[in-house]
């Protein structure tokens, strides 16, 4: 029994077939329509019945449109070109003394996502660096590096899904979340509560 390969229109025999998109292909005929890289069955995108690799081809051709995303019809802004080195004079008046460093935190201030030409790679809320698939831990609806998912008070490393949250930031359940945001009252230990010191009984 044989089938016809949708790409080369030659017979496909059972020992050489791969099935994808509801058709049987020769192994080396299942290629991306744009870059012609060999695809694995089920591990590719599809558009109008034709196979495409997910990145970069499908994303560039049919992905979301917008500034710096890279699909058809998007707007790609070029970075400003620096002036040629020959025009810059090297006189001492062009140099400024180094500025002292401030004691700011290491976390970078910036957008929560790093734009790429095929979509978005998220930035870690803990350190501000890109989080790649192999190193990500998903918690609070965002991707984190494993060592960056820490309690905001005691800095203990947390496990995804087994910690408390307040204003989008992670806290360990005990003692930090309870101490900071738990109920207020006698001997609980928060601001505004009454903590009684043990009474020293001295004989007079």
Curated annotation (Swiss-Prot):
The keyword Nuclease appears for this protein: no
Domain LIM zinc-binding: 3-64, 122-183
InterPro entries xrefs: Znf_LIM
Keyword Ion transport: no
Domain of life: Eukaryota
Tissues where this protein is expressed: Expressed specifically by the thymus.
Swiss-Prot/TrEMBL keywords: Cytoplasm, LIM domain, Metal-binding, Repeat, Zinc
GO biological process: T cell proliferation
GO cellular component, one term: cytoplasm
Region (Disordered): 88-107
SUPFAM superfamilies recorded: Glucocorticoid receptor-like (DNA-binding domain)
Record's protein name: Cysteine-rich protein 3
Naturally occurring in which organism (per UniProt): Mus musculus
């Amino acid at each position: 029994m044989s089938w016809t390969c949708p790409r080369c229109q030659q017979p496909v025999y059972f020992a050489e077939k791969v099935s994808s998109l509801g058709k049987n292909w020769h192994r080396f005929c299942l290629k991306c329509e744009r870059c012609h890289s060999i695809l694995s069955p089920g591990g590719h995108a599809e558009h109008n019945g034709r196979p495409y690799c997910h990145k970069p081809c499908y994303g560039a051709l049919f992905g979301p449109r917008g500034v710096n995303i890279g699909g058809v019809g998007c707007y790609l802004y070029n970075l400003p070109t620096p002036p040629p080195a020959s025009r810059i004079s090297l006189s001492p008046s062009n140099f400024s003394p180094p500025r002292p460093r401030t004691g700011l935190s290491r976390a970078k201030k910036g957008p929560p996502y790093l734009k790429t030409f095929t979509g978005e790679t998220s930035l870690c809320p803990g350190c501000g660096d890109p989080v790649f698939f192999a190193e990500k831990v998903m918690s609070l609806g965002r991707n984190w590096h494993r060592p960056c998912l820490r309690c905001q008070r005691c800095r203990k490393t947390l496990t995804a899904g087994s910690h408390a949250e307040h204003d989008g930031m992670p806290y360990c359940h005990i003692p930090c979340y309870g101490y900071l945001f738990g109920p207020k009252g006698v001997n609980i230990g928060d601001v505004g509560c009454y903590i009684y010191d043990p009474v020293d009984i001295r004989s007079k």
